[in-house]
């Protein structure tokens, strides 16, 4: 029976363009998993959206001379366009300024407050008398209290790496006006996370976590402390009965997964449909993030959910990536270590990029994108193994007049059957890799199947069989090779969907009925592809090159 699967990726911050690190970490893995689960025939909903509040947005909007809403509107569109260009198959891309978000965030707060999990406290914060407002860390710079570097940020020193509170800076000043700042008392609401340690530990024991982060998550939960969830800003979700305060972005943003699903349901004129995913325990909920977001998704948001009387679905699996670097350094547009995605796609095909990002995904440790590795993988793997297998078989078939290939049991020899059995086993291996969220291993399975096909075609040498007048054997070999290609397209589709579709188009297998499929959301195909192949017929069309050499 099909499963209902909810997939979410960390909401991208509407404060700048996306780069390869974002895509390889949280969005391509989620897209690949969504495509895989759709292939299995499951009821999949992939929700994402723009995170549109927070200090960094107000700071950069002011620097750009733009209104806050105008600024986030710009990046909401940019991000959506980027995901579309990259083939990230998000079912609905919402935003935290959606019409459902404000009330839902305030309801979360009110419920937590009523249960004694939120209390107000007085604290000292940096205040600009010239600007007449409190300034949070992103607005502040000064002298690092650890190394003495002048120009350190309000939350960490970019020179020595120390982290601290903005109030620890020596000679703090406003980034906007340059004015000196003073300490002034202010009141904030604090979420008492330390009161949720036991239920959080019990919950996290039931949740899939990559083994390399489980200890970190457990230790983090055991050491939870009260955390301020309000800010002195004008841009954000207003806090009920607390004048001039808005919610800290990391209190409101995760609730955007729920409000975004409400937004999706409303867009379909089925306003209650969100409940099928968020209020049904049978839903399988998988969350994809980068490692810098682990505390918020593994502890803070689950604590907020546990504090609600409405039984919102909590994640069943947290898939966290490590950092993805560019030539060994962090992506940084301001420091010139950056690749513009649009410019890159003007030169290289989308599936080349998707494949290399998947093959080098930072799953258990930091990894990097390098142009040399990109070139090597494209030329050696995509062209030399994958593309070569597809092209040589189909060109040989066309050149020698084989347009219709049908199964014939009496023509298959033992080596053919062994080849097909091994091909099907690799498909089952790929299914296991996708189920365990490993893009790297899935890429290895793809190349293993392509290599298997190449070896089989070489060993059978149909060009020799043709010279010997054994056309019946040639037909059997071509059928087996094309069946392998059909399976190769299947296991490739989650990662390189455009290429997989092109293979299916050239093979025109009777079993697929391509006209009835949605190219961008192929569904319910995986198990059917592994069924008995005895009724399959291929109607071959003119072969096209799938990949070209990268110079």
Swiss-Prot record:
Report the residue ranges where the short sequence motif 'KMSKS' region is annotated in this entry: 330-334
- Biological process, per Gene Ontology: methionyl-tRNA aminoacylation
Keyword Protein biosynthesis carried by entry: yes
Q: What reaction does this catalyse? A: tRNA(Met) + L-methionine + ATP = L-methionyl-tRNA(Met) + AMP + diphosphate
State the UniProt keywords alphabetically: Aminoacyl-tRNA synthetase, ATP-binding, Cytoplasm, Ligase, Metal-binding, Nucleotide-binding, Protein biosynthesis, Zinc
Q: Where in the cell is it found?
A: Cytoplasm
Q: Recite the UniProt cofactor note for this protein.
A: Binds 1 zinc ion per subunit.
Q: Which GO terms describe its molecular function?
A: ATP binding; metal ion binding; methionine-tRNA ligase activity
Principal place of residence = cytoplasm
Q: What SUPFAM superfamilies is this protein classified in?
A: Anticodon-binding domain of a subclass of class I aminoacyl-tRNA synthetases (SSF47323), Methionyl-tRNA synthetase (MetRS), Zn-domain (SSF57770), Nucleotidylyl transferase (SSF52374)
Lineage, top-rank taxon, reads Bacteria
* Cellular component, GO annotation: cytosol
EC category name: ligase
Task: State its cofactor.
Answer: Zn(2+)
Q: What InterPro entries would the database entry show? A: Anticodon_Met, Met-tRNA_ligase_1, Met-tRNA_synth, Methionyl/Leucyl_tRNA_Synth, MetRS_core, MetRS_Zn, Rossmann-like_a/b/a_fold, tRNAsynth_Ia_anticodon-bd
Described by its record, this protein's role is as follows: Is required not only for elongation of protein synthesis but also for the initiation of all mRNA translation through initiator tRNA(fMet) aminoacylation.
Instruction: Name the family.
Output: Belongs to the class-I aminoacyl-tRNA synthetase family. MetG type 1 subfamily.
In terms of HAMAP family, this protein maps to: Met_tRNA_synth_type1
Q: What is this protein called?
A: Methionine--tRNA ligase
Q: Which organism is it from?
A: Chlamydia abortus (strain DSM 27085 / S26/3)
């Amino acid at each position: 029976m099909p499963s209902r699967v909810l997939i979410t990726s960390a909401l991208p911050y509407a404060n700048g363009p996306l780069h390869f690190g974002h895509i390889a970490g949280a969005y391509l893995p989620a897209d690949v998993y969504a495509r895989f689960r759709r292939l299995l025939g499951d009821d999949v909903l992939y929700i994402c959206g723009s995170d549109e509040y927070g200090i960094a947005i107000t700071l950069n909007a002011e620097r750009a001379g733009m209104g806050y809403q105008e600024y986030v509107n710009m990046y909401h569109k940019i991000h959506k366009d980027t995901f579309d260009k990259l083939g990230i198959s998000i079912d609905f891309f919402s935003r935290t300024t959606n019409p459902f978000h404000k009330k839902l965030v305030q309801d979360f707060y009110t419920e937590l407050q009523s249960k004694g999990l939120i209390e107000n406290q007085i604290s000292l914060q940096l205040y600009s008398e010239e600007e007449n407002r409190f300034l949070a860390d992103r607005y502040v710079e000064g002298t690092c209290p650890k190394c003495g570097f002048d120009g350190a940020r309000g939350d960490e020193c970019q020179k020595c790496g120390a982290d601290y509170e903005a109030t620890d800076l020596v000679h703090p000043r406003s980034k906007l006006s340059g004015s000196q700042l003073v300490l002034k008392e202010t009141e904030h609401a604090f979420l008492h996370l330390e009161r949720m340690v036991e239920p959080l530990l019990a919950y996290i024991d039931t949740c899939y976590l990559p083994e390399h982060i489980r200890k970190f998550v457990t230790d983090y939960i055991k050491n939870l402390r009260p955390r301020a969830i309000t800010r002195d800003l004008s841009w954000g979700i207003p806090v009920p009965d607390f004048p001039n305060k808005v919610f800290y972005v990391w209190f409101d943003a995760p609730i955007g997964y729920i409000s975004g699903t409400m937004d999706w349901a409303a867009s379909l004129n089925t306003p209650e449909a969100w409940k099928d995913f968020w209020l049904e325990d049978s839903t399988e909920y998988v969350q994809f993030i980068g490692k810098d977001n682990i505390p918020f998704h593994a502890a803070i948001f689950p604590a907020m959910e546990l504090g609600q009387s409405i039984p919102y679905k909590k994640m069943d699996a947290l898939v966290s990536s490590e950092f993805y670097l560019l030539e060994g350094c962090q992506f940084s547009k301001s420091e010139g270590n950056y690749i513009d995605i649009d410019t890159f796609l003007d030169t290289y095909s989308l599936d080349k990029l998707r494949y290399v990002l998947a093959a080098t995904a930072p799953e258990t440790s930091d990894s990097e994108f390098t142009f040399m590795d990109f070139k090597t993988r494209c030329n050696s793997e995509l062209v030399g193994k994958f593309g070569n297998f597809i092209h040589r078989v189909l060109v040989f078939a066309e050149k020698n007049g084989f347009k219709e290939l049908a199964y014939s049991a009496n023509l298959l020899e033992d080596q053919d059957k062994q080849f097909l059995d091994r091909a099907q086993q690799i498909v089952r291996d790929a299914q296991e890799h996708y189920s365990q969220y490993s893009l790297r291993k899935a890429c290895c399975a793809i190349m293993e199947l392509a290599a298997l096909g190449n070896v089989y075609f070489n060993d059978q040498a149909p060009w020799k069989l043709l010279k010997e007048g054994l056309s019946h054997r040639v037909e059997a070999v071509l059928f087996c090779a094309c069946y392998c290609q059909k399976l190769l397209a299947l296991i490739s589709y989650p990662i390189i969907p455009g290429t997989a579709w092109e293979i299916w188009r050239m093979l025109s297998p009777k079993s697929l009925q391509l006209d009835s499929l949605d190219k961008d959301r192929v569904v319910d195909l995986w198990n059917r592809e592994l069924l008995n192949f005895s009724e399959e017929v291929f109607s071959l069309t003119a072969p096209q090159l799938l990949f070209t050499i990268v110079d």
